[in-house]
Curated annotation (Swiss-Prot):
Positions where Phosphothreonine occurs in the chain: 13
GO-annotated biological processes: hydrogen peroxide catabolic process
Name of the protein: Hemoglobin subunit beta
Keyword list, A-Z: Acetylation, Heme, Iron, Metal-binding, Oxygen transport, Phosphoprotein, S-nitrosylation, Transport
Length: 147
């Protein structure tokens, strides 16, 4: 559960309504793979990830980034019940994919950077603070099934 004030929730919702999920999702996942290259091991089937340019232009990275942000959008609609919303994804990433749960926090922080880049002055410190709460809540929900 994420505790947001009414003002924070309104700010998150208003900005998210302007987000191009395909563009921001692809960029966020791409940046995760470039900035934290050890995360690439989970995406070996995506083809060429040999350079930052290759990662950022990889169609499979972009498509999966869009999928990730689609799930994030679902989370925004269920901020009061994130553990339930992400239960299946948590189980998949824990039991089948064996993803280090720290990667969820890293991706959340990269997403905040990408949003700041895309929205500039509109991404005020107050909006950032609200999004930091949201990405932390999502990361915690995704890590819930880990022992």
């Amino acid at each position: 559960m994420v505790h947001l004030t009414g003002e924070e929730k309104a700010a998150v919702t208003a900005l998210w309504g302007k987000v191009n999920v395909x563009e921001v999702g692809g960029e966020a996942l791409g940046r995760l793979l470039v900035v934290y290259p050890w995360t690439q091991r989970f995406f070996e089937s995506f083809g060429d990830l040999s350079s930052p340019d290759a990662v950022m232009s990889n169609x499979k990275v972009k498509a999966h980034g869009k999928k990730v942000l689609g799930a994030f959008s679902d989370g925004l609609a269920h901020l009061d019940n994130l553990k339930s919303t992400f239960a299946q994804l948590s189980e998949l990433h824990c039991d089948k994919l064996h993803v280090d749960p720290e990667n969820f926090r890293l991706l959340g922080n990269v997403l905040v950077c990408v949003l700041a880049h895309h929205f500039g002055k509109e991404f005020t410190p107050q909006v950032q603070a609200a999004y930091q709460k949201v990405v932390a809540g999502v990361a915690n929900a995704l890590a819930h099934k880990y022992h």
